[in-house]
Amino acid sequence: CSHSMILYGEDRFTPAKKVALALTHLIQTQFAGDSLKLVLFHDSAEEIPLGALAGAQVGPYHTNTAEGLKLARRLLLAQKKDMRQIVMITDGKPSALTMPDGRIYKNAMGLDAYVLQQTLAEVTECRRAGIVVNTFMLARDQALVEFVKMVSSITRGRAYFTNTMTLGQYILMDFLKRKTRKVS
């Protein structure tokens, strides 16, 4: 829910919420034995109740992907489930990081090497914990696409590339089957 979701006159937040609401409905109705937690990440990360998703608003300016993944990992490890996965809906650019002393390091200029390194370290922690990260990417910037490819490759997850105009169609990169296909 970072501010980047509404930058440059393009609302990526509303489509992201639509995807999250649809996934929530699917899981609650078709996979009733599964549990679902929602984590919003911006300058930091927070868990929100399922009922609060529809009313969620764009938050602070930066995207602390590492903190969002860390919180999601903690929530998943607290549950006694065989299959653990994170479904991340993002516009892709990690631009903030929580430092060991609690301060937030922010850099919105390009992909900051330190933020990227620490974010990928958290992705690796997810993999070590047996957590797959599947990503819905709502942007087409090549650097961000490459970042999402790295996340998916590390965790053997899937990456779905779309935009706000073609949310019903997306490009699926399946890192388990090593295939790419267009889905409508």
Residue ranges and their predicted role:
Residues C1-A20, D91:
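MIDAS-like acidic motif and immediate structural context at the N-terminus
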Residues L26-G33, L77-A78, T124-I131:
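Arginine/glycine-rich "motif VI" loop of SF2 helicases in the C-terminal RecA-like domain
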Residues Q85-V87:
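Structural motif
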